[in-house]
Amino acid sequence: MAVKGVDISGPIAPCTAADLKAAGVEFVICKTGFGSDYPGQQDSGFAANVKLLEAAGIPWGAYHFSYATTRNGGISEAKHMLRLLNGRKPLYGVWFDMEANSTLGGDLPGAAEGFCETMEAAGLYVGVYASTSWWQNYLTSPIFDKYDKWVDRKSTRLNSSHQR
């Protein structure tokens, strides 16, 4: 069974929940922020987007854009995301977004494991997001087999067949 969803970052206004539903969107994955737990590294639209989705009864999940290159960096980013989630447990889980070229050469398996273990300890469903090329070229450690994968395959055609 296919379920139609979108991922968003920044404020989605003037888009409304009715617009999303009219487009057939059944769930949304919202960006919480990026990097470690420092002021200003939260997504500018996260809180408002979640409020809009919850009011409309649209289930959501969340992703965090990573710059972590170590296990401790992944843990720090998880703590940042947990603070931004503020106790919420999104139905569509939380996702560790690994696609920053600046992280290449770092301990990517350790960063992912630190993030994912921290989120699981908080009672959240967690997975790892990356593009097809990242999965094929950089995220090849068996550590990644412990977590669900969200594989981004971009398309320029609306309604094209792709997975997320």
Q: Residue spans of the language-model regions?
A:
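Single conserved hydrophobic/aromatic residue that forms the stacking wall/gate
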Residues: 158-164
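Glycine-rich anion/phosphate-binding loops
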Residues: 42-45, 68-82
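Short beta-strand/loop segments at the ligand-binding rim of alpha/beta enzyme cores
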Residues: 2-4, 59, 125-126
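Acidic (Asp/Glu)-rich catalytic clusters
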Residues: 15-24, 43-58, 81-90, 144
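Short, well-structured secondary-structure segments
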Residues: 25-38, 50-69, 93-94
